[in-house]
Amino acid sequence: GGKSFVGTEFTYNDTALRDTDEDNHTLVSENQSVPVGNSTYNCYVVKSDPKSKRNIEFDYRIQYFDKNTYIPVKIEYFDKSGKMVKKMEVTKLEQLAGVTGKKHNLRRVAEITNMLTGRRSVLTILSMELDKELKATYFSQNWLSTGKS
């Protein structure tokens, strides 16, 4: 649930994609200007309420989806009283081509702030390879647990 991801303010839930069917979604705005880092994005704003609160450390979240890439450039997490407890912002988006030449819009730098403690963590992806075939051993229980085959 809310376990820290390698000692940061990110949790394992923050680093995983949630299935859209796990939440009830409400469109709050179709055209909101949202400043994030050095950029301003034209966003769809969506309120997402988890259908099950089990293993979830927030009551609901507000997501700001960039209308050009459909990437959530900002996510605000709220508790039951409506107080913002955490905020995640993508401070660097980048378009990269994979080995096949296909272009992908990707989050390069994400920053998360714990509003209760003031602690902040920055996750930076320094390098990546796209559209590359992966060995099946990367998905074994041992590899996923230890990083070793």
Give short role names for the model-derived ranges.
Residues 15-32:
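A short, amphipathic edge element
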Residues 1-18, 37-138:
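Gly/Pro-enriched, hydrophobic low-complexity segments
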Residues 135-149:
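Short, low-complexity, Pro/Ser/Thr/Gly-rich segments in the mature regions of secreted, periplasmic
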